[in-house]
Amino acid sequence: MNALELIKQQHEEVAGLFKKYEKLAEHADAERQELFEQIADRLGAHAKIEEDYFYPALKKEDTEDDLREAVEEHLSVKRLIADLLEMDASDEEFDAKMKVLQEQVEHHVEEEEGDLFKAARKLLSKDQLDDLGIQLEEEYDTLMEGEPRNDVPAETEHAAPI
């Protein structure tokens, strides 16, 4: 699977988890907490592989603004995750923060799958996208062996470098 297919698959997986969460809203605190943790783990690992491998592969003069915006969006998402990690699903504000998290992720996905995917197709060959996909998947799988959500609070001071 090439890098773009992998990233899109991860986006779709998180979108599916958000949909499950919406159906549980205001019910089943333990299940909602578990879904949040699954979402946070996936988003934490996903942001890490994008910042460490995908975005650097796209760094050119004409992509710099889009990449800066992407890492700022990641920072905003990480800050919400850090806030949610300090809360319980039973807290009054939990569902509202989850909704904001979902909206920010959806916005980021829309821009990334548009502007950055277009840039990737222009800048990287098929072989480069394939190789990058392998690297992204291996790193993601390694991160997911742990609980990557727990690394997120340490990444909330400033946006990742590009």
Regions found by a protein language model. Give the residues of each.
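Small-residue-biased structural context
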Residues: 1-162
